[in-house]
C-alpha cells in the first residue's frame, strides 16, 4: 500500500519531471509503474529500498563511531580491557551482519 508520504515525495515529483505513468502496477507494492528515459521502474519500491539503505548506513556509522571510541580509550586494567574487547568484538559481528544483509562483503 502506498502512503501519503510516498505520493508526496516520490510519485508527484516524478509526474512533474515528465515521467510517464503506465497502466501496469508493481507486483510487489501495487504502485503504478513509471517510465522515464526508456527505463520502466517502480518508484515506491526504489524509494523504500533507498530509505532502508540510509537507515542501515546510519546504524553502521554509529557502530563505527562507538568502535573507534572504544579503541581510543582502552583501559590499563586487564578485566576492564577484556570487557572493552568483548564489546568491540560484538560490534564487529553486528557490522558484518549488516554488510551481509546489504549483500556486500
Swiss-Prot record:
Stored HAMAP family: UPF0148 (MF_00343)
Protein's recorded name: UPF0148 protein PH0795
Family, per entry: Belongs to the UPF0148 family.
Source species, domain of life: Archaea
Annotated signal sequence range: none
NCBIfam families: PRK00420.1-2
InterPro entries: SSSCA1 (IPR009563), UPF0148 (IPR022954), UPF0148_domain (IPR051888), Zn_ribbon_RPB9 (IPR001529)
Gene Ontology BP, a term: DNA-templated transcription
Amino acid at each position: 500500500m502506498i502512503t501519503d508520504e510516498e505520493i508526496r515525495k516520490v510519485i508527484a515529483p516524478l509526474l512533474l519531471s515528465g515521467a510517464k505513468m503506465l497502466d501496469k502496477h508493481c507486483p510487489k507494492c501495487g504502485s503504478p509503474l513509471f517510465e522515464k528515459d526508456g527505463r520502466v521502474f517502480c518508484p515506491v519500491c526504489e524509494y523504500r529500498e533507498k530509505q532502508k539503505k540510509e537507515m542501515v548506513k546510519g546504524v553502521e556509522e554509529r557502530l563505527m563511531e562507538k568502535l573507534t571510541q572504544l579503541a581510543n580509550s582502552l583501559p590499563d586494567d586487564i578485566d576492564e580491557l577484556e570487557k572493552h574487547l568483548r564489546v568491540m568484538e560484538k560490534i564487529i559481528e553486528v557490522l558484518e551482519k549488516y554488510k551481509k544483509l546489504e549483500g556486500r562483503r
